[in-house]
Swiss-Prot record:
Keywords: Decarboxylase, Lyase, Metal-binding, Zinc. GO terms for biological process: negative regulation of quinolinate biosynthetic process. This is 2-amino-3-carboxymuconate-6-semialdehyde decarboxylase. It catalyses: 2-amino-3-carboxymuconate 6-semialdehyde + H(+) = 2-aminomuconate 6-semialdehyde + CO2. Substrate binds at residue 47. Converts alpha-amino-beta-carboxymuconate-epsilon-semialdehyde (ACMS) to alpha-aminomuconate semialdehyde (AMS). ACMS can be converted non-enzymatically to quinolate (QA), a key precursor of NAD, and a potent endogenous excitotoxin of neuronal cells which is implicated in the pathogenesis of various neurodegenerative disorders. In the presence of ACMSD, ACMS is converted to AMS, a benign catabolite. ACMSD ultimately controls the metabolic fate of tryptophan catabolism along the kynurenine pathway. InterPro entries: ACMSD, Metal_Hydrolase.
């Protein structure tokens, strides 16, 4: 199964890639109304992209299937040491605040999210004062 998770944002003046590279199969967007575009492959419409799907991508919010988020890049092992926990936490918190959790599961036990949730300001920690004050409010 292939999952389409990119956001389908292309400028209106996108070049004709079939003409440029000499073969078909390129995806293009036809901006046909405010906040919507038709996604075309070889001139045939296969999906309408609505503005509300741009941030996360088209398929995850339209399809009945779930979305699994898993970061990957192995240079210096940073992803395993700090990247996966931090990036997974950032993704989890952004999606939680955006109300997008109906069909999503995160890798690595949610990264460091379970351990940092107490520091995330959602009417918690030092709210409404800046984090890290020795005596909050003074």
């Amino acid at each position: 199964m292939k999952i389409d998770i990119h956001s389908h944002i292309l400028p209106k003046e996108w070049p004709d890639l079939k003409k440029r590279f000499g073969y078909x199969g390129w995806v293009e967007l036809q901006h046909h109304s405010e906040g919507e575009a038709k996604m075309l492959k070889d001139g045939k419409v296969f999906r309408v992209v609505q503005e509300r799907f741009v941030g996360l991508g088209t398929l995850p919010m339209q399809a009945p299937x779930s979305l699994f988020v898993h970061p990957w890049d192995m240079q210096y092992w940073f992803p395993w040491l700090i990247g996966m926990p931090a990036e997974t936490t950032t993704a989890x918190e952004s999606m939680m605040m955006g109300g997008v959790f109906e069909k999503v599961x995160f890798a690595h036990g949610g990264g460091s999210f379970p351990f940092t949730v107490g520091r995330i300001v959602i009417l918690g920690t030092d709210y409404p004062f800046p984090l890290g004050e020795l005596e909050p409010g003074k």
